[in-house]
Amino acid sequence: MASLLKSLALFKKNKDKPPLAAGSGGAIRGIKHVIIVPIPGDSSITTRSRLLDRLVKMVGDPDISGPKLTGALISILSLFVESPGQLIQRITDDPDISIKLVEVVQSDKTQSGLTFASRGTSMDDEADRYFTYDEPNDGEERQSYWFENREIQDIEVQDPEGFNMILATILAQIWILLAKAVTAPDTAADSELRRWVKYTQQRRVIGEFKLDKGWLDTVRNRIAEDLSLRRFMVALILDIKRTPGNKPRIAEMICDIDTYIVEAGLASFILTIKFGIETMYPALGLHEFAGELSTIESLMNLYQQMGELAPYMVILENSIQNKFSAGAYPLLWSYAMGVGVELENSMGGLNFGRSYFDPAYFRLGQEMVRRSAGKVSSNLASELGITEEEARLVSEIAAYTGDDRNNRTSGPKQAQVSFLRTDQGGETQNNASKRDEARAPQIRKEARTSSKSDKYKEDTDKEPMSPSVKTLIDVDTTPEVDTDPLGSKKSAEALIRLQAMASILEDSTFGNDSPRAYNDRDLLS
């Protein structure tokens, strides 16, 4: 039996191991297509700013071809470095495309204000054909996407600081699209807006330079359909991370956006580890979980073997991503989702509608959290040096805070406050025969008010009121005089208050659709 278990562990380990490079050793290359990427031919800020302006307008052209759009986006993504050409050559290793770098310089002879740098040959016509587009023959204005603020005509600037801010604003909006472009492009608008608001509040971007929705949709669709563009973006992120020392501000912003990009499409695997295993609930000891725990262990080892590309396996369309799907460990995943829903409110919006979802193990996770609330793990307590007395104290505090948390989830309860209102009528009060009690007219429309004294109170009445009846106080029906002087004084004060209230109601105008609200503290005390 020991040899069987050893063989099983070895089998599980080798089953998920990626294939090793062997055999003929030749790399398989596909049929490549050429991508033209314009880069600045000098260090002038004017050249870069003008190139950025032309590229943004090119991307906003709805009729732009796919390879041309990819080249324009690669050029925009690399404009923040000192030598874009060297960066592109260093990080690009794509079997599907061949990148051709073209240096761009200023020119007064072209319509676009830019031309391709060449030795002895004029490339003005080629530059105009690349950077500009022809208007339709029918005379209609061609639709193009630009910034939401249509008053912005161009983004050409002369100073480096202004150029960096405009470039950072455009790059932030492009990089934010990568997080959801592959996994959930249809529901990405809300999360993208939250990221944009965050960087606007941090003054990393300029809010006035928010790109048009059509422009962003064009770029998002291109990122989703072009693997080569995603490979370049991932390679650029990894190159920035490897850079030692202080990084440019735009590079730091890209690394910050990368926190939303990494592990995209791997939520099932990551959350299963977080809620199913790291919580260390005793339910992991069930026999049903034994096989799936072994699967998770082998997948974690495989994840580490993939290195720095592992968090981007879904974005890079790596075929090994299917091994990390929740379908490989459905029971453990269902249990982990139940634990997560109970522990974190953000898990409530997760979509569980999958064929391998098991409701029984989902409820197991929920009940495990509920019944283990406030309990301290003995193994963890011994490692941390927690005594039994301290463990009991922690359990008591955890139970108290758990009850407080449950109370907060229902939301604050607002006390109902009512006011005296002048309604469209009153009602004659019935005679009262009880001692130390006087009945006042009850006004009913939407709010009901009770005025209390020490021995006198008003009764509520739910009968409809007629607008033709006036509110009156029947003095003859007041309670008989008490022999106690103090009680008589209180009775007199209460009667005065009731009469004052009745006079206010009688003086009001009937038929008013917007009744006034009285909140006189002296009358309501």
From Swiss-Prot:
Disordered as annotated region, ranges: 402-490, 506-525
Superkingdom field: Viruses
Location of region: RNA packaging and organization of the helical nucleocapsid: 1-375
Biased composition (Basic and acidic residues): 433-464
Chief place of localization: virion
Chain segments carrying region Interaction with the phosphoprotein: 477-505
Region entry Ntail, spans: 404-525
Region (Homomultimerization): 1-36, 373-391
Entry GO CC: helical viral capsid; host cell cytoplasm; ribonucleoprotein complex; viral nucleocapsid
Localization of this protein: Virion; Host cytoplasm
Spans annotated as Ncore: 1-403
Polar residues biased stretches: 408-432
UniProt keyword terms in alphabetical order: Capsid protein, Helical capsid protein, Host cytoplasm, Ribonucleoprotein, RNA-binding, Viral nucleoprotein, Virion
Gene Ontology MF annotations: RNA binding; structural molecule activity
Family: Belongs to the paramyxoviruses nucleocapsid family.
Subunit-level organization: Homomultimer; forms the nucleocapsid. Binds to viral genomic RNA. N0 interacts (via Ncore) with the phosphoprotein (via N-terminus); this interaction allows P to chaperon N0 to avoid N polymerization before encapsidation. Interacts as N-RNA template with the phosphoprotein (via C-terminus); this interaction positions the polymerase on the template. Interacts with the phosphoprotein; this interaction leads to the formation of membraneless organelles that function as viral replication factories.
Entry remark concerning the domains of this protein: Ncore is globular and carries regions required for N self-assembly and RNA-binding. Ntail is an intrinsically disordered monomeric domain in the C-terminus.
Role this protein plays: Forms the helical nucleocapsid (NC) in a ratio of 1 N per 6 ribonucleotides, protecting the genome from nucleases. The nucleocapsid (NC) has a helical structure with either 12.35 or 11.64 N per turn, approximately 20 nm in diameter, with a hollow central cavity approximately 5 nm in diameter. The encapsidated genomic RNA serves as template for transcription and replication; encapsidation by N is coupled to RNA synthesis. Forms the encapsidation complex with the phosphoprotein protein P. Before encapsidation, the newly synthesized free N protein, so-called N0, is chaperoned by P.
Protein's recorded name: Nucleoprotein
Gene that encodes the chain: N
